[in-house]
Curated annotation (Swiss-Prot):
The keyword Nucleotide-binding does not apply. It is a single-pass type II membrane protein. Residues 22-66 are extracellular. Pfam families: DivIC. This is Cell division protein FtsB. It comes from Buchnera aphidicola subsp. Schizaphis graminum (strain Sg). One of its GO terms (biological process) is FtsZ-dependent cytokinesis. Disulfide bonds: none annotated. The chain crosses the membrane at residues 4-21.
């Protein structure tokens, strides 16, 4: 019975390590999540810039036509 307890504790420890610091674990998830937030902000900034450029092009095209 004592060996079973030791084995189960070791198994629990190993699973927790895998969950937290293993490949695709929680720490990896947190890093990727932060990168996604930064990239979304960059994408929003680029979208605003693109919209401004589109408006400027349309304004210039209208100025040429008139």
């Amino acid at each position: 019975m004592k060996m079973l307890k030791i084995f189960l504790l070791f198994l629990l420890f190993w699973l927790q390590c895998s969950l937290w610091i293993g490949k695709n674990g929680i720490l990896d998830y947190i890093k990727i999540y932060k990168k996604i937030i930064v990239q979304k902000k960059k994408n929003e900034d680029f979208q605003i810039r693109n919209n401004q450029l589109i408006l400027e092009i349309e304004r210039l095209n209208n100025a040429i036509k008139n």
